[in-house]
Amino acid sequence: MFSIIFIALLILLITTIVMFLASILSKKALIDREKSSPFECGFDPKSSSRLPFSLRFFLITIIFLIFDVEIALILPMIIIMKYSNIMIWTITSIIFILILLIGLYHEWNQGMLNWSN
């Protein structure tokens, strides 16, 4: 038990030292606006290099990722059904699906699924 804690603390210490050294060694000495710009030659740009970003696409992407992870969590529940107690499995599944439906209702109620706004 003591050796496991010692190894964990040693790993934590080593990673902390490596991260500290990396942050010190990676800092730039002189910050110049032209050199920090996305252009390679260092001249002043005529227009902004930032492209407009649609917040709707971002929200739809986040919602898709959330529901994609939920599907990845539901699929193993089907396989586990025959190995577990049916009552506990049913209660767990109902609670999980209820949480999903509450989240979907909240997104719908907030207008995140309405593309026209």
Curated annotation (Swiss-Prot):
Protein name per Swiss-Prot or TrEMBL: NADH-ubiquinone oxidoreductase chain 3
Disulfide bridges in this chain: none
Record-level GO cellular component terms: mitochondrial inner membrane; respiratory chain complex I
Family: Belongs to the complex I subunit 3 family.
InterPro entries (UniProt xref): NADH_UbQ/plastoQ_OxRdtase_su3, NDAH_ubi_oxred_su3_sf
Its EC number(s): 7.1.1.2
Bilayer topology annotation: Multi-pass membrane protein
Gene from which the chain derives: mt:ND3
Ribosomal protein among keywords: no
